[in-house]
């Protein structure tokens, strides 16, 4: 599934009674919660538990849904956001990730 298709499908599950700011607030609270749940699964792995791959994928899917909800609230296209992110990373690390470049990022590099 492509990101644009996912975003369009995920839109059905947004509470349309909220304003754009309400939708984005809901999404950001939810995103924090889901990242915490995902973190908990990986924290247990450090304690000797095996990662439940299916559970982790479902939590990661929830993270994706909340990211899509923020984008949709403001009419932003996930494909465009993904492309912008890759372009930013390519400009920052033209030869792939380098620790030295990470330690000495240019001023204003967000």
What are these regions (language model features)?
Residues 1-110:
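Flexible "arm" and connector segments at domain edges
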């Amino acid at each position: 599934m492509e990101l644009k298709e996912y975003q369009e499908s995920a839109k059905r599950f947004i509470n349309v009674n909220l304003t754009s700011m309400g939708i984005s607030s809901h999404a950001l609270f939810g995103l924090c919660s889901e990242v915490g749940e995902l973190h908990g699964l990986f924290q247990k792995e450090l304690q000797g538990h095996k990662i439940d791959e299916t559970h982790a994928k479902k939590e990661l899917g929830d993270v994706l849904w909340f990211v899509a909800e923020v984008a949709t609230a403001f009419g932003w296209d996930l494909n465009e956001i993904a492309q912008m992110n890759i372009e930013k990373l390519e400009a920052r690390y033209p030869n792939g990730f380098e620790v030295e470049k990470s330690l000495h990022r240019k001023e204003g590099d967000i």
